Swiss-Prot record:
Family matches, as InterPro entries: Pept_tRNA_hydro, Pept_tRNA_hydro_CS, Pept_tRNA_hydro_sf
Active site as annotated: 19 (proton acceptor)
Record keywords, A-Z: Cytoplasm, Hydrolase, RNA-binding, tRNA-binding
Name of the protein in its database record: Peptidyl-tRNA hydrolase
Record-marked site positions (Stabilizes the basic form of H active site to accept a proton): 91
GO cellular component: cytoplasm
Function description: Hydrolyzes ribosome-free peptidyl-tRNAs (with 1 or more amino acids incorporated), which drop off the ribosome during protein synthesis, or as a result of ribosome stalling. Catalyzes the release of premature peptidyl moieties from peptidyl-tRNA molecules trapped in stalled 50S ribosomal subunits, and thus maintains levels of free tRNAs and 50S ribosomes.
Subunit composition and interactions: Monomer.
Reaction equation(s) it catalyzes: an N-acyl-L-alpha-aminoacyl-tRNA + H2O = an N-acyl-L-amino acid + a tRNA + H(+)
Nucleotide-binding as UniProt keyword: no
Amino acid sequence: MYIIAGLGNPGKEYMGTRHNAGFSVIDELADKYNISVDTAKHKGLIGKGVIAGQKVILVKPMTYMNNSGECIREVMDYYKCDIDDFLVIFDDISLDVGKLRLRAKGSAGGHNGIKSIIAHLGSDKFKRIKFGVGDKPKNWDLADWVLGKFPAEEYATLREANKKACEAVECILTDGIESGMNKYNG
């Protein structure tokens, strides 16, 4: 069984924000594979289903970004999931809008949600898909940038990136992270 988490913040006011890119990919996967991510459990919303022949649990932590690790730890413990079978999708300001970067492991890179997951799991050796949201303009506050909504002219790019992220998840599940990195890291 694979646990696939997308990071974001709960609440309508955060829908469509850069920080909720992970939630958007989970929603896209849920739609594509008819998985209802609506069971409130383990400080998150979860849904069970099958993607690319693998049993999966899709997770949207409801702890707010900076405490995402609380939810992930509870889900991992409850389902007795090994860290090798965990994948997280999250926003990355160091990548252009819609660009993806897959990694097998790594530091938090300044991302508080990932920092929380590393702290709660006691390891940084988990797979991840970084979803590019673009760097903040000069003189902008970082929080204002990541909590801001994407402009309408980026919607088409985001739709394509969501589809590409779903394909990357499928690739990881069927062929492994190395294959995914070779195919999707541009």
